[in-house]
């Protein structure tokens, strides 16, 4: 499968303090992903692969069908956005991965998701 310049992805993460418990080494993050179809043909997101790395270098792999229970079709010029979450044992870490995509001709491709940070914000006084 080849990378496709026709589809792009953006990710934004946020620390969820209310669901976290630092004393129990539980740090909860939400991340919002936007997938934009910049091409001329519809595409569908079939599956996902994530590599989650905590601040100690511990890696967790997550893969499965679709995202948040769906395999969205994205029309030309359209986008699909969803929010999900990750729990790690340290106040910082990273995520990266790819989506398994297919166009309307049945051509499969990987949409790479560049590394992004999961980090508890630092308070500045």
From Swiss-Prot:
One of its GO terms (biological process) is error-free translesion synthesis. Residues 1-125 form the ApaG domain. It comes from the Bacteria. Gene3D superfamilies: ApaG domain (2.60.40.1470). This is Protein ApaG. Transmembrane segments: none annotated. InterPro entries: ApaG_domain (IPR007474), ApaG_sf (IPR036767), Uncharacterised_ApaG (IPR023065). SUPFAM superfamilies: ApaG-like. It holds the Pfam family DUF525.
């Amino acid at each position: 499968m080849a990378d496709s310049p026709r589809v792009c992805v953006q990710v934004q993460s946020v620390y969820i303090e209310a669901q976290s418990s630092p004393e129990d080494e539980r740090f909860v993050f939400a991340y919002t992903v936007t997938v934009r179809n910049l091409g001329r043909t519809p595409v569908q997101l079939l599956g996902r692969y994530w590599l989650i790395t905590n601040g100690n270098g511990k890696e967790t792999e997550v893969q499965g069908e679709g995202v948040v229970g769906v395999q969205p079709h994205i029309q030309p010029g359209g986008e699909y956005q969803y929010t999900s979450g990750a729990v790690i044992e340290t106040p910082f870490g990273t995520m990266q991965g790819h989506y398994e995509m297919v166009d309307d001709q049945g051509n499969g491709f990987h949409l790479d998701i560049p590394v992004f940070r999961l980090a508890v914000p630092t308070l500045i006084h």
